[in-house]
């Protein structure tokens, strides 16, 4: 699906905890520019944190790309998390609550899917993962 880009995209390289905080803040700022209410600002920031944390935990480094988008007058925020890490061997399993290969609670990806309005994931084992999530302004 192709959307009109409202503003220049923001790219945040992710390889440490401080980058997670930076991506979260940039995403919150973009969502605020779009006019999201404070509850949705928190939702977008939380989703970005989860995706960035997964990059640090599993892929070591990657990137969060943030965009303000427009779909025939419907405005929103698009978050793309991409990495060249090991990939996810079983995406279906990874999308189940409680599944984790690192001993975490296993709520990250399923949580992002629930928080955002649209969610797509593609992963090539041994090559990396890309997650795209969108939140639309109500």
Describe the predicted segments one by one.
Residues 1-11, 52-138:
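Conserved beta-strand-loop-beta-strand hairpin that lines the nucleotide-binding pocket
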Residues 1-46:
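Bergerat-fold GHKL ATPase/HATPase_c domain
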């Amino acid at each position: 699906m192709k959307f009109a880009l409202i503003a220049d995209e923001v790219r945040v390289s992710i390889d440490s905890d401080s980058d997670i905080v930076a991506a979260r803040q940039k995403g919150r700022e973009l969502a605020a520019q779009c006019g999201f209410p404070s509850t949705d600002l928190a939702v977008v920031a939380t989703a970005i944190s989860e995706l960035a944390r997964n990059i640090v935990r599993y892929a070591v480094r990657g990137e969060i790309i943030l965009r303000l988008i427009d779909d025939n007058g419907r405005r929103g925020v698009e978050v793309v998390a991409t990495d060249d890490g090991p990939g996810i061997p079983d995406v279906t399993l990874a999308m189940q609550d409680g599944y984790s290969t690192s001993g975490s609670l296993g709520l990250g990806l399923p949580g992002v899917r629930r928080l955002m309005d649209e969610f797509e994931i593609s992963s090539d084992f041994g090559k990396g993962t890309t997650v795209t999530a969108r939140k639309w302004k109500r």
